[in-house]
Structure formats: structure tokens, C-alpha cells
Regions:
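GH16 jelly-roll
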Residues: 1-172
Length: 172
């Protein structure tokens, strides 16, 4: 039944945790401030699917969702950088638009159009983060660049394939 919402995903970590959890202690070892972040990936296609590779703020009190599932916003100090968010329904025929976002500022949201279907083959998606600048790349070509304040602290990497209805489309 396509009208039933279904949330499932494959991801590297559950980013909704408290500072005392074992998972938080492990992620602390992999968090960093600034650098080059890269993945070679073949994205999936299909409505209701979201390919995602992103950085999340290291501080568990500043995450987009609380451990109880309540959503916070930019005013609450939430920091997230989307290296790539590609909806499975946005293949070459539907525009192949990639979301590239810096979630702590109103001026850091980009919708970039690529002239290829990301589900047809592997591509290298990357982001360079330095003080005052964040730039996004695909196969070595710069897609977008944000100039302005950058996140003040360490962040950790998350990678996921989500199945969900709503803003990413009804599930096929």
C-alpha cells in the first residue's frame, strides 16, 4: 500500500544518541574539524529513496533530532552539512538535482543540477571544508561553493540510504 508511510534505512550510525552512550564515545574518535570528505558511490533510483552522505555536529545537544525524536532548528544551534542528498526520483529524466546544504545558516542551501544519471555508474562525491569556505565536488568538478561562517566544532561522517515517503516522493 503506497499510502502507508514506511521509514527504513541503511546507514553508518544512528545519530540520535546522548553524550553518555557507547556509540557517542566511539564517534568521538572519528570526529574532525575541517578537511576533505569523499565517497565513490553509485546512487539508487526510485521514488521514496534518498541517497545521503553528510556531516553531523559532534555535540549531541546540538543535533537536528533529540534522542526522543523531537526535531530542532537552526535557532537551536543545529549544525549539519550535507555533502550529497540525492532523491532516487531525481535521475536524469527527472532533473538529477542534488541537495548540498549547510544547515546552520539560511544562505547555505544549494540545489545543483548534474547532466548525468547518478544511478548509471559510480561517481566521486566530495566536499572540502575549511574556515570560511565549503565547496562541493563531483568527479573532480566543483558543483557549488559556500563562503561565510563555517561550523565552529568537530563533526562526524554519516552515510545512508533512506526509504521514506513525504518530501522525497511516494514510495514506488
Amino acid at each position: 500500500d503506497k499510502s502507508t508511510r514506511c521509514v527504513s534505512c541503511i546507514q553508518t550510525s544512528d545519530h540520535r544518541f546522548g553524550a553518555t552512550t557507547a556509540e557517542y564515545q566511539i564517534l568521538d574518535k572519528f570526529a574532525q574539524k575541517y578537511g576533505w570528505f569523499e565517497i565513490r558511490a553509485k546512487c539508487t533510483r526510485g521514488s521514496g529513496l534518498l541517497n545521503a552522505f553528510w556531516l553531523h555536529q559532534h555535540d549531541p545537544t546540538k543535533q537536528e533530532y533529540t534522542p526522543e525524536g523531537e526535531r530542532k532548528n537552526v535557532g537551536d544551534g543545529v549544525v549539519e552539512i550535507d555533502i550529497i542528498e540525492l532523491q532516487g526520483r531525481h535521475n536524469a529524466a527527472a532533473g538529477n538535482d542534488v541537495n548540498l546544504n549547510v544547515h546552520f545558516t539560511e544562505k547555505g542551501h544549494f540545489l545543483h543540477h548534474n547532466d548525468f544519471d547518478a544511478a548509471d555508474g559510480f561517481h566521486v562525491w566530495a566536499m572540502e571544508w575549511e574556515e570560511g569556505r565549503i565547496a562541493w565536488f563531483c568527479d573532480g568538478d566543483r558543483m557549488e561553493e559556500y563562503i561565510g561562517p563555517t561550523p565552529p566544532g568537530k563533526m562526524f561522517i554519516l552515510l545512508a540510504l533512506f526509504q521514506y515517503s513525504g518530501w522525497i516522493g511516494d514510495i514506488d
